[in-house]
Amino acid sequence: MGKGRSYMNSYADGYMRGKVVKEVGALLEHMIVEEITTPTIINLEFGSAYDTIRKLRQQETSISFEIIRQFCYVIGYYLYKEIEAVENYKKDVRNRESRLAMLYEMKEKYKKIYGMQAVVVLNLMHQGKDLLALMKRV
């Protein structure tokens, strides 16, 4: 282990990862239940394995910080698209106001979990950047 990296795989690191996985997993599950996206769409568009999506939804602590970072883009992408569709009447919903209130609440939770990373993702989406293309660049 290199100098300065002794915290990795420590109890503190595992504890932190567990807390973050719990929050991200719950938000992802809520998005899937509310039909904002599906595991199949996530797999097709972002290349995330079904097993990874399942583990995150079940809040398994074996999920790495790299996966957590990847899902910052995934969650931000689908939340932004859904909010935009409902706001602009591009998606037919029974109760538009309650749907928007729920989406705004999810967006705030997303920003609380991911902080500055969430702000960057949402700004990229607002600027019309193709997030899927950006994710696939090497």
Please report, for each region that a protein language model flagged, where it lies by residue:
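Short, charged recognition helix plus adjacent turn
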Residues: K3-Y7, G14, G18, E82-V138
